Amino acid sequence: MPELPEVETVRLGLQPAMEGFRIDRAMANRCDLRFPFQPDFAARLTGQTITGLGRRAKYLLADLSSGDVLLMHLGMSGSFRVVNGAGDATPGEFHHPRSEDRTHDHVVFEMSSGARVIFNDPRRFGFMKIFARAAIDDEPHLKGLGPEPLGNAFDAAMLARACAGKQTSLKAALLDQRVVAGLGNIYVCEALWRAHLSPKRKASTLADRKGAPTDRAVRLVDAIRAVLGDAIKAGGSSLRDHRQTSGELGYFQHSFAVYDREGERCRTPGCNGTVKRLVQNGRSTFWCSGCQT
């Protein structure tokens, strides 16, 4: 499933074709994806201008001139294709090669920019939903999400407070979207390596006895921000499912220090350890026991 950098790269790729432009026509080519489309889905979108295209955690949010918001989630295999006079491009094609099977083109937006924006999703784990902007605080998919890891609200003090007293592993805590929004398996592994912290360490050790952030919390916040920033600049990680809107693959996977590198030499200078793999909560964790403590 795409993580924050992949979704952000998709957002950046869609902006030139969608933000500030009117949806001249919206079409849903089937009655459902992961969830059924609302009965008035196409009608509520057609004729509306996308006044802003944002992101919250792993969700894309299109603000509409009607006061509604279109929430979009890529799921496991969803991708957007932008077709215009310049050709055919796919923002954020990272994990799976883009499906060439047009029978999986499930949603089409014909924009006043002249572009056709097409959502293709072979597995149909993605979904789209419209809700009123005024009700955003009550939207179930967004309610309870933690702070954005690249936002000002995310700092060592906040992370220490969120993890104080937690006996769960540090890896599990970071994957909890209530603690911090948008992180997934890849970037948690990479951030823990950069911060030299074991994924098995208790989350509570990010706070001291008084609840103040320890040096570990400071290092981890810096590492999370850095790894996400680097991944966005690189266009995400091309492992299985998603390409950029340009159709190009992301390149951050070439910079992986530990993820999917089991048995290889650790890249920390002076460390003679090797990358190990363990399973935590049903997910593979990659780490170096030599320098991550």
Swiss-Prot record:
GO terms for molecular function: 8-oxo-7,8-dihydroguanine DNA N-glycosylase activity; class I DNA-(apurinic or apyrimidinic site) endonuclease activity; damaged DNA binding; zinc ion binding. Its cofactor is Zn(2+). The keyword Lyase applies. InterPro entries: DNA_glyclase/AP_lyase_DNA-bd, DNA_glyclase_Znf_dom_DNA_BS, Formamido-pyr_DNA_Glyclase, FPG_cat, MutM-like_N-ter, Ribosomal_uS13-like_H2TH, Znf_DNA_glyclase/AP_lyase. It catalyses: Hydrolysis of DNA containing ring-opened 7-methylguanine residues, releasing 2,6-diamino-4-hydroxy-5-(N-methyl)formamidopyrimidine; 2'-deoxyribonucleotide-(2'-deoxyribose 5'-phosphate)-2'-deoxyribonucleotide-DNA = a 3'-end 2'-deoxyribonucleotide-(2,3-dehydro-2,3-deoxyribose 5'-phosphate)-DNA + a 5'-end 5'-phospho-2'-deoxyribonucleoside-DNA + H(+). SMART domains: Fapy_DNA_glyco, H2TH. DNA binds at H104, R123, K166. Keywords: DNA damage, DNA repair, DNA-binding, Glycosidase, Hydrolase, Lyase, Metal-binding, Multifunctional enzyme, Zinc, Zinc-finger. Gene3D superfamilies: 1.10.8.50, MutM-like, N-terminal. Binds 1 zinc ion per subunit. GO terms for biological process: base-excision repair. The active site is at P2 (schiff-base intermediate with dna), E3 (proton donor), K58 (proton donor), R283 (proton donor). A zinc finger (FPG-type) spans 257-293. CDD domains: EcFpg-like_N. It holds the Pfam family Fapy_DNA_glyco. Its EC number is 3.2.2.23, 4.2.99.18. PROSITE patterns: FPG_CAT (PS51068), ZF_FPG_1 (PS01242), ZF_FPG_2 (PS51066). Belongs to the FPG family. Monomer. Involved in base excision repair of DNA damaged by oxidation or by mutagenic agents. Acts as a DNA glycosylase that recognizes and removes damaged bases. Has a preference for oxidized purines, such as 7,8-dihydro-8-oxoguanine (8-oxoG). Has AP (apurinic/apyrimidinic) lyase activity and introduces nicks in the DNA strand. Cleaves the DNA backbone by beta-delta elimination to generate a single-strand break at the site of the removed base with both 3'- and 5'-phosphates. This is Formamidopyrimidine-DNA glycosylase. It comes from Rhodopseudomonas palustris (strain HaA2). The lineage of its organism: Bacteria, Pseudomonadati, Pseudomonadota, Alphaproteobacteria, Hyphomicrobiales.
